[in-house]
């Protein structure tokens, strides 16, 4: 029994590695900055509430196959693998703008797996997953709720909606062009056949969940006080779909909590404050991109925001920096986990291909933003 529990604990830690790294980092910094009343100022309750509300409603929509059916219908319009891959990538791209990058991947990676395996096109799986991953990370850059770091910076600096999109539009357009070119160049227009399996969604619950989704988005855009969503959305889902509340990615929320503690403490260590302030003064954009490659984009956004008011370059840096290493984005770990789960023994080749495409995208986008 003990060994069984130990196995379950190890499996849980492996599944939530980033959360445990964040927890350890937070605990270590507590030795340098002992807990006090200032800790309460570390936590951005509104950001955590927005994340929870969006994740909960997305889980409810996922449970009625809303995204799956929507995506599958779009894919079935196309008759060759190149167009199908483009459709999968664009669905993930658009989905990340609406439901955040990690949830877009959790929703549409299984669809990509289904399309490729059911049509005998498994050879394109690594490429498709990598493009979906890049699309999720870069597609989410355009909107405040497209990824967690955007939501955090948007809330912290109170960035106006129009200004936010003006900052992110140029690299967003370049990303669209690059992703499209890659899919055209690396995927042949081979014929594609897929069985049409009818699927329906309950109309009443669909309307209800879409209304809740609209409420969640209104909270993100500051149209409604966050506490209203924190009361209404869980209350409705308790009766409509209790399972959705259990499915919420709570480790992601805890990761944020731990990184709030970590970044808050780091900001109070004099040596760290002086070093980061110096580096960010030299180039906020470049340092934030590099930081993402080491500690991921979400913690980079949380940590570096303590040392600079240059939210424009920080916003660009933590979005562009989301592509690069496997740990540059929490979403990339989702893709890696999903791919290796179905392709054991191909980890090395996947990491090589992943690194080649991601670093190419990062360098091109960083150069574009710095030059133009």
Residue ranges, per PLM feature:
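Interfacial loop-to-helix junctions that mark the boundaries of transmembrane helices
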Residues: 8-15, 37-47, 159-171, 198-204, ...
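Structural signal for alpha-helical transmembrane segments and their membrane-water exit/capping regions
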Residues: 2-3, 7-38, 50-65, 184-189, ...
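Hydrophobic transmembrane alpha-helices that form the pore/transport pathway of multi-pass ion
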Residues: 90-138, 152, 302-315, 344-346, ...
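C-terminal transmembrane helix pair
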Residues: 165-176, 286-372
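Membrane-interfacial loop-to-helix junctions in multi-pass transporters
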Residues: 44-47, 76-89, 118-128, 203-208, ...
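Membrane-core helix-loop-helix motifs of multi-pass transport proteins
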Residues: 120-188, 193-198, 337-365
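Transmembrane helical segments that form the transport core of multi-pass membrane transport proteins
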Residues: 42, 64, 68-71, 212-309
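Flexible interhelical linker loops that connect adjacent transmembrane helices
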Residues: 72, 185-210, 242-246
């Amino acid at each position: 029994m003990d060994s069984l529990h130990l196995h379950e604990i190890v499996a849980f830690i492996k599944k939530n590695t980033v959360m445990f790294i964040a927890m350890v980092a937070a605990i270590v910094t507590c030795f340098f900055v002992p807990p006090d009343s200032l800790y309460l100022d570390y936590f951005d309750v509104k950001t955590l509430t927005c994340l929870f509300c969006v994740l909960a409603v997305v889980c409810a929509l996922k449970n009625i196959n809303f995204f799956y059916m929507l995506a599958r219908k779009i894919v079935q319009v196309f008759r060759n693998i190149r167009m199908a891959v483009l459709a999968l990538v664009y669905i993930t791209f658009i989905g990340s703008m609406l439901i955040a990058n990690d949830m877009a991947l959790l929703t549409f990676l299984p669809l990509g797996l289904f399309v490729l395996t059911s049509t005998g096109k498994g050879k394109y799986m690594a490429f498709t997953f990598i493009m979906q991953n890049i699309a999720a990370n870069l597609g989410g850059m355009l909107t405040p709720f497209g990824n967690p770091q955007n939501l955090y910076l948007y809330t912290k600096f109170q960035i106006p909606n129009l200004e936010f999109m003006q900052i992110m539009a140029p690299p967003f357009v370049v990303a669209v062009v690059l992703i499209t070119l890659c899919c055209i160049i690396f995927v042949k227009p081979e014929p594609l056949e897929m069985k049409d399996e009818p699927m329906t969604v309950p109309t009443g619950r669909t309307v209800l969940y879409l209304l809740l989704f609209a409420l969640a988005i209104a909270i993100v855009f500051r149209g409604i006080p966050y506490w209203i969503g924190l009361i209404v959305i869980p209350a409705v889902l308790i009766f409509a779909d209790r399972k959705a509340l259990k499915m919420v990615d709570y480790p992601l929320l805890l990761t944020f909590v731990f990184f709030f503690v970590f970044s808050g403490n780091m900001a109070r260590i004099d040596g760290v404050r002086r070093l980061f302030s110096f580096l960010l003064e030299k180039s906020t954009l470049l340092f934030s991109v590099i930081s993402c490659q080491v500690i991921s984009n979400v913690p980079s956004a949380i940590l570096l925001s303590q040392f600079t008011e240059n939210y424009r370059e920080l916003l660009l840096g933590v979005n562009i920096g989301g592509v690069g290493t496997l740990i540059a984005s929490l979403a990339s770990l989702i893709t890696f986990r999903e791919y290796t789960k179905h392709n054991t023994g191909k980890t090395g080749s996947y990491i090589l291909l992943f690194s080649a495409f991601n670093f190419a995208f990062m360098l091109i986008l960083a150069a574009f933003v710095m030059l133009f």
